[in-house]
Structure formats: structure tokens, C-alpha cells
Amino acid sequence: MAEITAALVKELREKSGAGVMDAKKALVETDGDIEKAIELLREKGMAKAAKKADRVAAEGLTGVYVDGNVAAVVEVNAETDFVAKNAQFVELVNTTAKVIAEGKPADNEAALKLAMPSGETLEEAYVNATATIGEKISFRRFALVEKTDAQAFGAYQHNGGRIGVISVVDGGDETLAKQISMHIAAMKPTVLSYTELDEQFVKDELAQINHKIEQDNESRAMVNKPVLPLLKYGSKAQLTDEVIAAAEEAIKAELAAEGKPEKIWDKIIPGKMDRFLLDNTQVDQAYTLLAQVYIMDDSKTVEAYLNSVNASVVEFARFEVGEGIEKASNDFEAEVAATMAAALGK
């Protein structure tokens, strides 16, 4: 019988992603044959993989790949952050992004049928990864972004790959595009412009903002601070010409009541109108890229900065691992009880 050395176990683990004990057992059963051990691990793992199908996988990584004028960003999930750092897992994520960019599938169903370099389909690769790594590994989503020769991609990953961003910039180079992607990673916009926000969504978000103002006003009243006014608007989409005109007239009335000479109104009104727009577009600032203060130049919004350099953002995609996935939070006592019951064979 072949000697099962630590080096042999390590080699098998690196190739298969299996745990120490599983790798050692497989080598013992196959008399130290690495290839047979990998196949054995896979066979044993298939049954385990089926049992893991219903588990929640909310950790993982994003992958970003640029192929000429096509770029892909993908999210791949695992059950634990520890496995997300596994070399086999990282390679799977990066290969998936490459295959998606080159294959340009229409949806997840089509993506799962794409061929991996190993010859297996994407779907088969994930079943095998679940089997060998030992916990549920799942391909969650992807986005494809395309550009012209004259445009630039901004590819960026943040926080060890937990956030992946691709942006397309027209009229700028890759440096600007990457800076825009860095902003997107940090500030979490969901759409490019206020024109893409749903009307009811804006109303709901405005209600939440006003609720927070009301809570703050309760605290302010307790210490005799002046209360803050509730907001009527949350997005530029709600600021019609009539609303803007009415706001300007209200400012003029305020200046007249304060006794300010009319000859200096033209110097005061623009600043007050800017403040009105800032206060009444808070939903835009939270969710739309162009309305946000640019992290590279906080004296300007992203839109104002882009205008100053004659550039524009055409499109972007941002993935953050685990977005929208509800993680299981088991009661500790119940978990201990379940573990004891399993140990006792109940």
C-alpha cells in the first residue's frame, strides 16, 4: 500500500478543494492514486451536493472580466466566507466571468449550458464544486455590458471581490471610467438618472425620509431646537416648471419680508434655489449616479464633473455579494439541541 504523506494530502486538497480528512480517506481508499481519489471524492460528493441544494448560500465573490468590447460581472455564492477564499472557488468565479463574457448568454438558464474549459457545462461545474468543496456553491447572476471602440470600460472590484463594478464611459479614458466605478462601488447607486426611478418608489422613499425627519424633530423639540420642515419632493422628476417657479416666488417673498433690497436678489436667489434643489432631490442623491456628490471631487455632483470634462456615463452594473439574500439565523439553543440529537441518533 502506498504511503499517504502530508504532501500527497496537500496536493489532493489543492486539486479538489476537499477537507483534510476527506482527502486522506480518499487517498487511503484509492491506494494513493490522486486521479482516482479526485473521482472518488466527486462520486461521494454528488450525494452530498443534492442534500445541500436547499441550503442558503449568501457569502461568495463577484467576478469581473473584460473581453474587448464586452465585459461581464458575475456573482457566485458559497455558504461561508472561509470557502469564498478557497483557491478552487476563486478560480471558478474568474472562469465563470470569462465564459459569460465570451458566450454572451441571454439569461441564467442559457448561462448554465455554456461550456467550461474543462468540457463540462457551467451547471455541471457548480454541482462538482459543491461535491468537492463540501458546501453549497451556486451561480447566482450576471450582467453583460458592451461598448464601442471609442468608449472605455471601468472595471473595479472592492473589499476583496465582494463588490464588482463595470461602467461604460463615453468621452473619457479607462482612468476616468475606473474612478467612476470606484464611486459606484462606494456610493451604491442603483440607476443612472432620476428618469429611471419608479414614481411609487420615489413616493415611498420620500415617506421614509419624512418619517426620519419627524423622529429627529421629536428629539430637537426636547432640547428646544427648531424643528425641521417636512419635504414635499424627493426627486427631480417631481420638480415641474410650476414647482420651480413657485419655489422662486417663495424665495422672493421671503427676501422682501426680510427687507433685502431687490437689487441684490439676483445674487441671493441662485444659492437658495440650489439649496431647494438639494433638499428636494434626496431620493435621487441616494439612488441615482448622476445626482450623487462625486467622491473624487466633492464640490461637484457626478453629472457636473462629467460635464466639466465633456464625458458621460452610458451604462453601469454593480453587484454586491449577498444583496437580497435572506441569511438563516438559527437560534443557538435550537442549534445545540439539534446537534445533540444528531449525535444521539434521534
Swiss-Prot record:
Top-rank taxon, per record: Bacteria
Annotated Pfam families? EF_TS
GO cellular component terms, alphabetically, are: cytoplasm
Q: List the molecular function annotations (GO) for this entry.
A: translation elongation factor activity
Q: Where is the signal peptide?
A: none
- For region Involved in Mg(2+) ion dislocation from EF-Tu, the annotated ranges are 80-83
**InterPro entries in the record:** EF-Ts_dimer_sf, Transl_elong_EFTs/EF1B, Transl_elong_EFTs/EF1B_dimer, Transl_elong_Ts_CS, UBA-like_sf
Q: Primary place of residence?
A: cytoplasm
Q: Where in the cell is it found?
A: Cytoplasm
* Keyword set includes Transit peptide: no
Q: Which UniProt keywords apply?
A: Cytoplasm, Elongation factor, Protein biosynthesis
Q: What does this protein do?
A: Associates with the EF-Tu.GDP complex and induces the exchange of GDP to GTP. It remains bound to the aminoacyl-tRNA.EF-Tu.GTP complex up to the GTP hydrolysis stage on the ribosome.
**UniProt similarity note:** Belongs to the EF-Ts family.
Q: Kindly provide the name given to this protein in its UniProt entry.
A: Elongation factor Ts
Query: To which species is this protein native?
Result: Streptococcus suis (strain 05ZYH33)
Q: Which gene encodes it?
A: tsf
